[in-house]
Structures are given as C-alpha cells and as structure tokens.
C-alpha cells in the first residue's frame, strides 16, 4: 500500500537549501550541466555540508521523535530540486550521513519544481532560488526563499 501524505505537514524544499551546493552551483553556472554532474558524481561519497535551511530541516524531521513510524509521522520533508538524479543520490547520502530522515525526492534535471507541489500535497515550498519561489507563489503555493 502506498504511503499517504494526507493529514501531514508536507514541506517541499530544494536541495541547495538543505545542503551547501554553492560551489557545485558555480560550476554549473560557469561551465555546463555535464561538468556539474561530473563533479557531483566525483563527490558522491563526500557528504555535503549543511545548507542555509539545514538546521530547520533537522528540527522538522525531529518533530515526530525517533520512534515515530511512517503511519504516525505528522511532518514529511520532501526534496524538490532542479538537480539531476546523480546529484539526488548525493543529497540522500548526505542526509543519511547527517542523520536526517529524508526519504522522498523529485529531481527535475533543470525543470521548474513547482508543478510537483500538488501531487506531493506540499503545504509549503522552501528554496534558495528566488525565481522558483516566485513561480510557486504565482501558481498559488505558499513559498519562501531561505537564505
């Protein structure tokens, strides 16, 4: 049976808000997506440092306590990112290393992430990208830029 997100606080958050991928992002902006993906693949086993919303995510996932089963959880943090799937692997490995319960993610490989907010039943979208926040707000979703 699929997991239901009904009745939960679902916070969708970008990977750059959770983890500090600013150096990698500069490679993407300076070079191209192939160089960016190669760098992320090269650093796959290197946990990323916390991003601007790292402490917030830690508090959100700790809200249910360590013993909360999937059915008992009231808060779900979902990564919604323009990143590619290889970078997604690094996100989840970094989360595991940091002790963060991040189990779901959407990696759009450059496409805008806000269309995924409805299927995820997201109550809030947080991102370090002001354009993505503006697009989500324009589409009627509660959103905020974290910095």
PLM features: what roles do these ranges have?
Residues 1-147:
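HAD-like aspartate-dependent phosphatase fold
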């Amino acid at each position: 049976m699929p997991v239901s997100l009904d009745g939960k606080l679902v916070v969708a958050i970008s990977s750059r808000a959770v983890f500090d991928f600013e150096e990698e992002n500069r490679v993407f902006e300076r070079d191209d997506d192939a160089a960016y993906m190669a760098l992320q693949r090269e650093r796959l086993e290197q946990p990323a440092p916390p991003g601007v919303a790292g402490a917030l995510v830690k508090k959100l996932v700790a809200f249910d306590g360590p013993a909360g089963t999937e059915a008992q959880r009231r808060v779900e943090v979902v990564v919604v990112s323009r990143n590619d799937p290889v970078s997604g692997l690094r996100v989840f490995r970094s989360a595991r290393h940091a002790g963060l319960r991040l189990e779901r993610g959407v990696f759009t490989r450059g496409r805008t992430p806000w269309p995924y907010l409805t299927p995820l039943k997201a109550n809030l979208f947080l991102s370090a990208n002001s354009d993505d926040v503006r697009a989500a707000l324009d589409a009627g979703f509660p959103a905020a830029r974290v910095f």
